[in-house]
Amino acid sequence: MDIDNFKSVNDTLGHAGGDEALKLLADTMRLVFGTHVLMARFGGDEFVLCIQNRDQEGVQAQLDKLVRSMCQTFTYGGCSVPLSISLGAVYMTEKFPYEKLFKEADSVLYEVKTRGKNSFEIWKI
């Protein structure tokens, strides 16, 4: 998952504003998922969510809520920018190495961003 057009957020609001946008995302993820998910910043504006033992429909509803919650105008220091996220997810039916999961999730994320961002998609592997 990453913040759409994060470079323009940083360019407009400065790095302190970008940091606040990242904090908003982390806080929103906590509200949506609670303690039932492992969340980690993967680098820059990219995050990884690891959700175990959940039904696909429930996860889909939570991801939809997260994407909708993050689609907003974000204001920092008197300046405002549009904010949204794109998310690629994989739903595994058997065990895979983490490297494969990350690679597949990154491929899904690329597809979402190619189609226009501010969305999510889940691939079953």
Regions picked out by a protein language model, each given a short descriptive name:
Residues 41, 70-86, 113:
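Catalytic core regions of nucleotide second-messenger enzymes
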Residues 50-52, 90:
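Short hydrophobic/aromatic beta-strand micro-patches
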Residues 41, 89, 121-124:
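Structural signal for conserved beta-strand scaffold positions within catalytic alpha/beta enzyme cores
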Residues 11, 52, 113-114, 125:
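Short, conserved catalytic or interaction motifs in soluble domains
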